[in-house]
């Protein structure tokens, strides 16, 4: 019976996380962590490690799919990724020096707000609009956005995927598919770094939820990325917005449930 419950929870967690990653470049940690903590009683630190490990392959397969469809900016993505990684460490260090800030639901609110934004004000930037930007301005914006995302992620420990998507579409002027493709490309490496450090510090988790979450998230991320790359910009904005709003509400519900039962 316990195996059945674990499989069902991991399937639902992988479904939500995979769709969020493939459609919107959302971090799997936002969905998987609260579900594992609430329904399987897994320690939050271990649950985050499992979620980050699930993120690695799901983000990698999504990035490959977006890249194959020419919806990935590797050059500027690498610049942003390096700055994100450096300033995540800086943010973590600064966070350790100041009184603890509890912003556990930050990424959930980011998810909800972004979802509403995509429905109400879709990102209709085109590839032609993107090519009008100068290489220098894109490079400078990549560094600035990387610093912001990295520092905030390190400081409060959440919100990377959604913040990246917001900055890539609103500040850097990417069209939605390229923004998601670049976001999942960066997340592949940030999630890998995060999961390795988690398990190096806290030890390996229970193998069943670990393997199931990775497999289910990977499958649904692959499906979502394939659909997203074939969809029209208007449809993709709407679908992405609806998925983010639903996931935001569901995760917020799990968070409230775990607080009530705690």
Give names to the regions the model predicted.
Residues 1-17, 33, 37-39, 44, ...:
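Juxtamembrane transmembrane-helix boundary motif
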Residues 1-6, 10, 53-64, 159-168, ...:
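Hydrophobic, membrane-facing alpha-helical anchors
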Residues 18, 48-56, 180-191, 244:
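Transmembrane helix-bundle signature of multi-pass membrane transporters/permeases
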Residues 19-28, 68-72, 171-181, 234:
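Membrane-helix interface "capping/anchor" motifs
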Residues 23-32, 157-167:
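Transmembrane helix boundary and interhelical junction motifs in multipass membrane proteins
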Residues 42-50, 75-76, 173-184:
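Membrane-interface alpha-helices at helix entry/exit sites of multi-pass transporters
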Residues 53-61, 86-90, 94, 185-193:
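Membrane-embedded alpha-helical segments of transport systems
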Residues 54, 182-198, 208-221:
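A small-residue-rich subset of transmembrane alpha-helices
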């Amino acid at each position: 019976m316990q195996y059945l419950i674990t499989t069902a929870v991991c399937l639902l967690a992988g479904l939500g996380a995979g769709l969020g990653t493939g459609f919107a470049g959302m971090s799997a940690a936002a969905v998987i962590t609260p579900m594992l903590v609430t329904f399987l009683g897994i320690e939050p630190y271990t649950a985050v490690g499992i979620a980050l490990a699930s993120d690695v392959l799901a983000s990698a397969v999504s990035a490959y799919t977006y890249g194959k469809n020419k919806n990935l900016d590797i050059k500027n993505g690498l610049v942003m990724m390096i700055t994100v990684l450096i300033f995540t460490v800086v943010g973590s260090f600064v966070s350790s020096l100041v009184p603890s800030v509890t912003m556990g639901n930050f990424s959930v609110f980011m998810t909800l707000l972004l979802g509403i934004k995509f429905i109400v004000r879709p990102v209709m930037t085109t590839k032609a609009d993107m090519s009008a930007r100068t290489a220098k301005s894109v490079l400078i914006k990549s560094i600035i956005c990387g610093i912001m995302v990295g520092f905030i992620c390190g400081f409060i420990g959440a919100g990377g995927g959604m913040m990246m998507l917001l900055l890539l579409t609103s500040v850097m002027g990417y069209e939605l598919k390229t923004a998601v493709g670049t976001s999942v490309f960066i997340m592949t490496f940030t999630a890998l770094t995060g999961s390795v450090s988690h398990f190096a510090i806290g030890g390996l988790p229970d193998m069943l939820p670990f393997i199931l979450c990775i497999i289910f998230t990977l499958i649904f991320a692959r499906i979502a990325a394939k659909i997203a790359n074939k969809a029209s910009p208007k449809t993709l904005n709407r679908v992405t917005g609806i998925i983010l709003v639903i996931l935001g509400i569901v995760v917020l519900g799990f968070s409230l449930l775990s607080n009530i039962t705690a």
